[in-house]
Amino acid sequence: MLKNQKHAILYALSAVFLWSTVATAFKLALMQLTPLQLVFYASAFSWLFLAIFLLVNGDYQYVKTAFLSKPLLYLKLGVLNPFLYYLILFKAYDLLPAQQAQALNYTWAIALSLLAVPMLGQRLRKTDIAALMFAYLGVLIISTKGQFTELNFESPLGVGLALLSTLLWALYWIFSTKNTDKPVISLFICFSIGLPFIALVLSWQNAWQIPTVKAWLAAAYVGLFEMGITFVLWLMAMKKAENTASVSNLIFISPFLSLIFIFTFLGEAIHPATIIGLGFIICGLAIQKLIKSK
């Protein structure tokens, strides 16, 4: 693929814009569906998009070979994403204000550096510890709305689930380091494995229902713009980029843009502690990113 920085930035900005809308979309969708139902229907839409994408670009023929080469790895990945990760994440969004849940979700990169120590044998440097302290201080500020000395959490379970989702996502990426298959092929296989697990749990809980039109639209939006199209746009941005660092830095726009959508469409009053805490989280991520780029 020919490199083109302008095209890369356009792809990246499109992805960032769409990712910035999903926190709002999650909350709107959860007004229509339970977290488990949303995981299933959104994953189904994402699976359909990925299947069509692979058929169009000719990569569908490699799916079977990729799966058979490492079935146990794909089983682990598929259980993690979409099944466990999104189920836990959507439950966190169900319990927390969108502004809190989306901010806490951005700490997954810090969770990744923590898990990489025991699982990949990496060392935790002083800069990693500094990044960790900044990020989790931000988590504390957001979770307690600035009253962190009192440790008065609005929803301890919601905060716990949001942080657990970051560990699950970090775990997914650590397992993915062993995978050399094309990203879209890998993601399609994961969704092909994850969907039956979600369906089994839905059946076990007798939670099937025919969605309303609003619920279908909400699930389609989440499936396409959180799990499907946006992922492909970001991959295109990385492939087109002449300077990947400058393109990948655009992701830092997303959490703040997301707050605008949350305020506009959900009517949530953005608490000052959310902005301050998010600033600490972004500082932590920036420290981590700057050190890795050296």
What residues fall within each predicted segment?
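Membrane-interface helix-cap regions at the ends of transmembrane helices
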Residues: 21-28, 32, 46-67, 137-152, ...
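Hydrophobic transmembrane alpha-helices of multi-pass small-molecule transport proteins
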Residues: 50, 115, 124-146, 257, ...
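Helix-helix packing/entry segments at the starts of transmembrane helices
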Residues: 15, 41, 100-107, 176-195, ...
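Transmembrane alpha-helices of multi-pass small-molecule transport proteins
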Residues: 32-84, 111-115, 167-172, 188-205, ...
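Glycine-/small-residue-enriched transmembrane alpha-helix faces in small-molecule transporters
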Residues: 1-40, 79, 148-178, 193-197, ...
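Hydrophobic/aromatic residues within transmembrane alpha-helices
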Residues: 29, 38, 42, 92, ...
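Specific transmembrane alpha-helical segments of multi-pass solute transporters/efflux pumps
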Residues: 18, 22-23, 51, 58-105, ...
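Juxtamembrane helix-entry segments on the extracytoplasmic side of multipass membrane proteins
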Residues: 4-9, 32-40, 66-71, 144-165, ...
